[in-house]
Amino acid sequence: MTDIAVLVHGAGSCPATAALLLGPAVPDGVTPVAVTARADVESVVDVVDAAAHGCRVVLVAGISLGAHAAALWAVRGGRADSLLLAMPAWTGAPDPVAALTGRSADEIARRGRAAVLAEISAAAEGDWVVEELRRGWETYDDDALVAALRAAAGSTGPTRTELAAIRTPTAVVALADDPLHPESVARTWSAAIPGAALGIVGRHEPATDRGALGRTGRTLLRGA
């Protein structure tokens, strides 16, 4: 039986970004499996389950919507040695952060992803988040990207009650000063999950160390 780590990207992102940001959390000797997650969170839970089938799952690591899916997978009986939940975006019913994702989808539908990305890039030149956004968006056509973002915006995240049911050793990692993935949400998740460890990565730290989120998670899980 193969030992694997399932890596789950966020809405509008891609497996390459998940591997880059979360890969350092994968223990030595474990095979990373970066899945494609282009649907609503319930469908992404099924993707994680399919990837895990027939393997020993050492780690499930998700970022943004991928973190939501990883948590729900564990709640629903998925078995892993550990969880890394990075940059969760909301808890329970879609909130104003989800609405921002929906508005991004509307803008792309109206103007096209190239125009929207150019505007974002001009407003935040050199920002690593924008660079990773570009990496992800360029793997979609406009219709597919709009569909993925709208699916994410309408997805319910894990509730506090569901998070409290997780029994897998868990690290929750926030990115400081990120309005789309508020630190307060990560704190809520870590407080709700029994025994979870919380880490905060500086907003600009991944600019020079893309693996900072994954590395922080691995350090936290070693202490769990």
Residue ranges and their predicted role:
Residues 131-160:
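Hydrophobic, aromatic-rich cap/lid helix
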Residues 194-224:
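Catalytic active-site module of serine/aspartate enzymes centered on a nucleophile-bearing elbow/loop
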Residues 75-109:
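Flexible "cap/lid" loop of the alpha/beta hydrolase fold
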Residues 179-185:
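Conserved alpha/beta-hydrolase "acid-adjacent" motif
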